[in-house]
Amino acid sequence: MVPAYIPNPVAALCGGGTPIDFCRNYTDGRRILGNGKTYRGLICGVLAGVLIGLVQIWLVGTYHWDLPRQTILSVTLLALGALLGDMGKSFIKRRLGKERGEAWPVADQYDLVVGAFLLTIIFDPAWFFAVVTLPVLIAILVITPVLHRSVNILGYWIKVKKEPW
């Protein structure tokens, strides 16, 4: 799951530039995604997630670390899925009239999990169901909000984020 946890903070660090929605509005008159979702953030975030996944693959293969077996496909799907989940949440937030940075408990914490899981289930279901067992799922559900909050507070302290959530 580490390849899914890395992309969002890296996207925040590296973001800026052209918004993915090209500043266009949806049929409701609101932005499709908003300025917080940029091509630079997407590319950097996915690359960082894939890179950390490749490190995991290397550690398991070289040092026989007891980590979930990853593949290049699984780390790519987890990394991309995490950011697609975040974008999906942003799309829904805009439809609900929520502003960029406005807190949306639960959705803010689990969007990356939903996106990563959905993309992986669609394109690599054998890997997903072999690795994401019930104990692993429970661990992810418990760890994710704590990790999310901690990283966001850190991002706020170092002035990468305007809000600590």
From Swiss-Prot:
Catalyzes the formation of CDP-2,3-bis-(O-geranylgeranyl)-sn-glycerol (CDP-archaeol) from 2,3-bis-(O-geranylgeranyl)-sn-glycerol 1-phosphate (DGGGP) and CTP. This reaction is the third ether-bond-formation step in the biosynthesis of archaeal membrane lipids. It is a multi-pass membrane protein. It catalyses: 2,3-bis-O-(geranylgeranyl)-sn-glycerol 1-phosphate + CTP + H(+) = CDP-2,3-bis-O-(geranylgeranyl)-sn-glycerol + diphosphate. It is found in: Cell membrane. One of its GO terms (molecular function) is CDP-2,3-bis-(O-geranylgeranyl)-sn-glycerol synthase activity. It holds the Pfam family CarS-like. GO terms for biological process: glycerophospholipid biosynthetic process. Pathway: Membrane lipid metabolism; glycerophospholipid metabolism. Its cofactor is Mg(2+). One of its GO terms (cellular component) is plasma membrane. Its EC number is 2.7.7.67. Coiled coil: none annotated. PANTHER family: CDP-ARCHAEOL SYNTHASE (PTHR39650:SF1). This is CDP-archaeol synthase. Keywords: Cell membrane, Lipid biosynthesis, Lipid metabolism, Magnesium, Membrane, Phospholipid biosynthesis, Phospholipid metabolism, Transferase, Transmembrane, Transmembrane helix. Belongs to the CDP-archaeol synthase family. InterPro entries: CarS, CarS_archaea. The chain crosses the membrane at residues 41-61, 72-92, 103-123, 127-147.
